[in-house]
């Protein structure tokens, strides 16, 4: 009788362990798959807006990239990989208006004023945040934060062409950005 009872419990323990193991594998695979978007974004234009005027009044109608061996995926990974700098709630940043108007704080014109590079939406940047600004998740909530690219990507516009330099010093004014963000 004891042997039959032990086999019965052992059978159910094995089944339970199998179910738990399968659930853990599914959870791990799902988590990895959700993070892989950073590595599959290979937009050939790297999310660059191809027409514009910078804060100095220089116009450009195309963007090229300094030949430094970076693929489109490399650039987009650099632009959109969080550094854990959770600045403010993401949903708040998306709808935040400028302090002196009803225009969005994140509008291309306003972002360009600070020397940051406006972007169009891509797989890894679905809301079209500027280069170096990213959605990050912390304790179950989404935040807007900065990546290394905020301070280390620049674009020089000359003769109608924007030359994007990934990893170079940005031509941005973070102090004014932060002051105006606080005022908004």
Where do the PLM segments sit?
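The canonical Cys-X-X-Cys-His
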Residues: 145-155
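Extracytoplasmic c-type cytochrome modules immediately beyond a signal peptide or single-pass transmembrane anchor
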Residues: 31-139
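Conserved structured core elements
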Residues: 10, 142-145
